Amino acid sequence: YVCDCRENDTGLSACKAMIYLDSAATSFYKPEQVEQAVCRAFHTIGNAGRGAHAPTLEASRVLYRTRAKLAQLFHAENASRIAFTANVTQALNMAIDGLLHAGDHVVTTVCEHHSVLRPLYKKQENGVFLTIVSADENGTIDPQDVQNAMRENTRAIVMHHASNVTGNVFRPPIPSA
């Protein structure tokens, strides 16, 4: 989506050529394969685990096969540990809530989305130690700053890999186990 924002005589912006990078949250079009799979699911399968009739059993098989493929992709030992959520925000909230407990330490960055920072602040209110790493004037995070923020009780580093705001790709240090 391209748009050049210039004020018109009403004081409002008339967009003519701006590059809008937040496609993850607002993209309308999906790949054709996704559209076909959704339509097929609506018309041919039921709710997984909710009955013994053919459409429900097929839904359960699809769910099982999908979990198995994802477990293989991510080298997960147990496919039943793969969880599906409505969106990334819900997934992050679940992970943050389940992983961090009083006394734990977490590292994040000043560049993170509101949907990451809010649950981290809530955890901080409940005894989790939070370190927020700063960015430079270009929105770049120095990997050494992340490494330096880590402590003995660091349980997680919660941050994006690539920013749709700055276009920066972050290559974090990989801590040893």
Residue ranges and their predicted role:
Residues V2-A177:
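Pyridoxal 5′-phosphate
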